[in-house]
């Protein structure tokens, strides 16, 4: 029996719309615009104690001025500049803006715009029209999450990375190998956590994407080695720090283990259990890579990145923005997010709620630090179980000659755009 059934030859469906779009857009667009304005002009402009932008901007200014870039004292708890020389070279144009406030506001605005554009692309990838109410509702809901709010408040690059991820998924689905490879290569250059996503073009045999995904960060770093002042210190000073598991502001499993003093054997056991669930879920999802390409690509991406957040040496709650493409599969006929357990998980890794309690201060503090850990772990479990159920069910369905094939499960409820 084939591990990956061949999709039937059908024409691309027309983007979907709902009969409620007129009312939905009238409600959702004003809310989305007002929430975006508040997040930008109030929350982001005011900023917070945690400030990712100043660290990056200062390093880029050192690059422009010819001062060694990697000169920080890593035993302080301040945000540190951790980008490799190639990423420094890529981001260098930001350092040529000499006005700090202007540079910061522009950077925040670009990230906010990138989030909006990413949601538009994910709306289309999910099969819905941009004129439907899906896009503005998604934007409005995203503005309520911790990941979007803190990305803007801390002024980091996650909004741009989300757009790059959405473009990469579009390229995988539409077989645009070279563009997809360039985009994912740049994403890997900035954040190596995207490296496991090269699995997607590998199994789809999109060799151009795989080649560029590897060569892009290699070439940038090779060139930057001769251009970035003190580039060698990235290897001698920064990389050893990156290999450490810090015991503060760290929601990963290793971070939890070091915080609570978990025995090494127990940490390794949990690591292997969750790593195995991620791997088996990815293998089970392979069956749908041709029949349901967006569902497969987004769900595989989601479980791989969640595995990275949960199992790596550093996991921070706002990384959860990269799970948004997986959440968009809710709009399709098959999704992990059709299961209520996935939404319990989403609450823990997306909610901006704070946990304070005078009666249970320790429990409240643990929830502040590790709510994302709970959410990521739960999402891995529910994805693993769902993928196995789908895999077994699909094998049985394909083995039944009389089983009907439904080509449009939503035709009773939806209208098509002209």
Swiss-Prot record:
- Tell me the lineage of the source organism: Bacteria, Bacillati, Actinomycetota, Actinomycetes, Mycobacteriales
- Name the chemical reaction catalysed here: Adds an alpha-D-arabinofuranosyl group from trans,octacis-decaprenylphospho-beta-D-arabinofuranose at the 3-O-position of an alpha-(1->5)-arabinofuranan chain attached to a beta-(1->5)-galactofuranan chain
The signal peptide here is none
Q: What is its EC number?
A: 2.4.2.47
Concerning its family, UniProt says: Belongs to the glycosyltransferase 87 family.
Q: Which Gene Ontology cellular component terms are annotated? A: plasma membrane
Write the record's keywords in alphabetical order, separated by commas.
Cell membrane, Cell wall biogenesis/degradation, Glycosyltransferase, Membrane, Transferase, Transmembrane, Transmembrane helix
Provide any one GO MF term from the record: hexosyltransferase activity
Task: Indicate yes or no for the key word Transmembrane helix.
Answer: yes
By what name is this protein known?
Answer: Alpha-(1->3)-arabinofuranosyltransferase
**Any Gene Ontology biological process:** capsule polysaccharide biosynthetic process
Compartments reported by the entry: Cell membrane
Pathway annotation from the record: Cell wall biogenesis; cell wall polysaccharide biosynthesis
Segments spanning the bilayer are: 25-45, 81-101, 102-122, 125-145, 153-173, 183-203, 210-230, 266-286, 293-312, 327-349, 372-392
Membrane protein topology class? Multi-pass membrane protein
Q: Which cysteines are joined by disulfide bonds?
A: none
After gene disruption, what is the outcome?
Cells lacking this gene show reduced levels of cell wall-bound corynomycolic acid methyl esters (CMAMEs).
> What is the native source organism of this protein?
Corynebacterium glutamicum (strain ATCC 13032 / DSM 20300 / JCM 1318 / BCRC 11384 / CCUG 27702 / LMG 3730 / NBRC 12168 / NCIMB 10025 / NRRL B-2784 / 534)
* Top EC class for this record: transferase
The gene name reads aftC
Q: In which broad location class does this protein mainly occur, judging by the first location in its UniProt entry?
A: membrane
Briefly state the protein's biological role.
Involved in the biosynthesis of the arabinogalactan (AG) region of the mycolylarabinogalactan-peptidoglycan (mAGP) complex, an essential component of the corynebacterial cell wall.
Domain of life (superkingdom): Bacteria
Pfam families (UniProt xref): GT87 (PF09594)
Q: Does the keyword Transmembrane helix apply?
A: yes
